Amino acid sequence: MGICSSTCCGGRARDGLYEPVLADSEREAVADLLQYLENRGETDFFSGEPLRALSTLVFSENIDLQRSASLTFAEITERDVREVDRDTLEPILFLLQSPDIEVQRAASAALGNLAVDTENKVLIVQLGGLTPLIRQMMSPNVEVQCNAVGCITNLATHEENKAKIARSGALGPLTRLAKSRDMRVQRNATGALLNMTHSDENRQQLVNAGAIPVLVQLLSSPDVDVQYYCTTALSNIAVDASNRRKLAQSEPKLVQSLVNLMDSTSPKVQCQAALALRNLASDEKYQLDIVRANGLHPLLRLLQSSYLPLILSAVACIRNISIHPMNESPIIETNFLKPLVDLLGSTDNEEIQCHAISTLRNLAASSDRNKALVLDAGAVQKCKQLVLDVPITVQSEMTAAIAVLALSDDLKSHLLNLGVCGVLIPLTHSPSIEVQGNSAAALGNLSSKVGDYSIFVQNWTEPQGGIHGYLCRFLQSGDATFQHIAVWTLLQLFESEDKTLIGLIGKAEDIIEHIRSIANRQIEPDNEFEDEDEGEVVNLAQRCLELLGQSMSKAHIEG
């Protein structure tokens, strides 16, 4: 609408035919506009006569009138932001293309204000708003740069716009402006770059535009907002394995910068620094680098804070770091065990509980010494106290941790005496396959070479069907893994040479029947790997029957 009028006005003005008419309409529009501005609180500038008066000034060839129009748009959008239509946006977009700095500055401010509204964000891009905004980002005027970047930052918060912005050529100028000496421009540019990091494709475009070194360099900015935007953007970029490889090759100072930011005075920066390190620590190299950069002490401080997001980001990070076997002892020596155990009971936040118990399991994974230290820190007592009442995801992690600790021959008696069977047996009834399997695996580990089997005798039928009920259900489940766990556990119980326990098994006709059924199973040669697994279960079942026969014969002879 507006551009067409402008062309017509420009064309007729040369021969003077309509010049007085245009001048009159402009004078009339100025007078009307002044009257509307007198009553601005009651005037809707986005429709009807007020918008027509503004549009007349916009499409005038008089630069002063264009300046007045752009300043009016900037002023009214400062206090009245709402959804508008193309009749409002097109005049502002026309003003963006003016060569005049004042017009550009005010028009981009107005557009940035309107770009706060969700519907306007989409329409501005649909009407071609990105091209003039990109041009303004390259303006030598800092105010124009600042407003244009601020507008793109707002536009980039809408999912529908992000890919369009990434493909528009805006990322190069945004990356350059992130290094601006003007803090407002820098802040807006890094905010826009952050908004572009929420999808794989856009992150890739950002990396290709050379944003990574700029974001890393700006981690040392004195401005907290810039630190936050850059840390969060790098955290999102580090989600992708290919980007982590690029970061590892080109940014040797990244880990140390993020470790330093965990000591920031701003909790939101601390939080994002820990989350960025957590994403980096998906890779082995970074798991080691964070420990070498003295990242454990600041993580421990965050883990012990009273602010939930800080605790969550720190415990998520330490979980990933603890995956590397070489980090187990350094983490334990930094005194993480007790705080991690305390986290299990001090919050009902499921994520925090999962990360905490998973970290404890990782720390116990590769040495009996570390398993003993985890046990001494009270991890098992805390799990026993909580496990029947926590969400299934936490139950799964807790039972997996107990199963790992139960691998240590030195700790089995201690674990049994703590009463873990009293919670593991009921959890074999869980609706979760994982919880069932972990609980049964823990019972199986505890049944091997334990010395004193009296607790298995005590728990033969209780609680909830006891060891007897659990073995029966797993043997008849039809699940190869469950059957394997149950048959292997039975074999350990037979090998215990505990007469009372073996006598109880011998009298359990249902168990013996299931064992015979498995022992007599014919293996179909369909799948080589399945055959091996099934063959092992059959062999274990046959060995159980053999030991049962020997013990029964021995009992007859002794009798």
UniProtKB/Swiss-Prot annotation:
Its main location: membrane. PANTHER family: VACUOLAR PROTEIN 8. Keywords: Lipoprotein, Membrane, Myristate, Palmitate, Repeat, Vacuole. Functions in both vacuole inheritance and protein targeting from the cytoplasm to vacuole. ARM repeats lie at residues 77-116, 118-157, 159-198, 200-239, 243-282, 284-323, 325-365, 409-448. PROSITE patterns: ARM_REPEAT. It comes from Gibberella zeae (strain ATCC MYA-4620 / CBS 123657 / FGSC 9075 / NRRL 31084 / PH-1). Disulfide bonds: none annotated. Belongs to the beta-catenin family. A lipid is attached at G2 (N-myristoyl glycine). One of its GO terms (biological process) is nucleus-vacuole junction assembly. A lipid is attached at C4 (S-palmitoyl cysteine). InterPro entries: ARM-like (IPR011989), ARM-type_fold (IPR016024), Armadillo (IPR000225), Vac8 (IPR045156). This is Vacuolar protein 8.
